Amino acid sequence: MSGKKSNLPDGRIPDRLPDGRPAVAWKSRWTEGTLPLWLVATAGGMAVIFVVGLFFYGSYVGVGSA
């Protein structure tokens, strides 16, 4: 995150500044150094659909297709 010194006992950076503004900008909060969860979920969902489609394709072609 940032090099700010925290006054909280567990070392967290406060969520809001005293005037009510967010302590960390929204854009950097969601895109700083990590993959967004929606991107991971989309890739995982596409992989699941691909594998299930492969099983359905295999049931009509090759062994087990009658």
Curated annotation (Swiss-Prot):
InterPro entries from the UniProt entry: PSII_PsbJ (IPR002682), PSII_PsbJ_sf (IPR037267)
Keyword check for Nucleus: no
Topology in the lipid bilayer: Single-pass membrane protein
Residue ranges of the TM segments: 37-57
SUPFAM superfamilies: Photosystem II reaction center protein J, PsbJ
GO cellular component, one term: plasma membrane-derived thylakoid membrane
Domain of life according to the entry: Bacteria
Protein location: Cellular thylakoid membrane
Keyword line: Membrane, Photosynthesis, Photosystem II, Reaction center, Thylakoid, Transmembrane, Transmembrane helix
GO terms for biological process, alphabetical: photosynthesis
Chain's role: One of the components of the core complex of photosystem II (PSII). PSII is a light-driven water:plastoquinone oxidoreductase that uses light energy to abstract electrons from H(2)O, generating O(2) and a proton gradient subsequently used for ATP formation. It consists of a core antenna complex that captures photons, and an electron transfer chain that converts photonic excitation into a charge separation.
Family (UniProt): Belongs to the PsbJ family.
Record note on quaternary structure: PSII is composed of 1 copy each of membrane proteins PsbA, PsbB, PsbC, PsbD, PsbE, PsbF, PsbH, PsbI, PsbJ, PsbK, PsbL, PsbM, PsbT, PsbX, PsbY, PsbZ, Psb30/Ycf12, peripheral proteins PsbO, CyanoQ (PsbQ), PsbU, PsbV and a large number of cofactors. It forms dimeric complexes.
PANTHER family cross-referenced by the UniProt entry: PHOTOSYSTEM II REACTION CENTER PROTEIN J (PTHR34812:SF3)
Protein name per its UniProtKB record: Photosystem II reaction center protein J
Name of the gene: psbJ
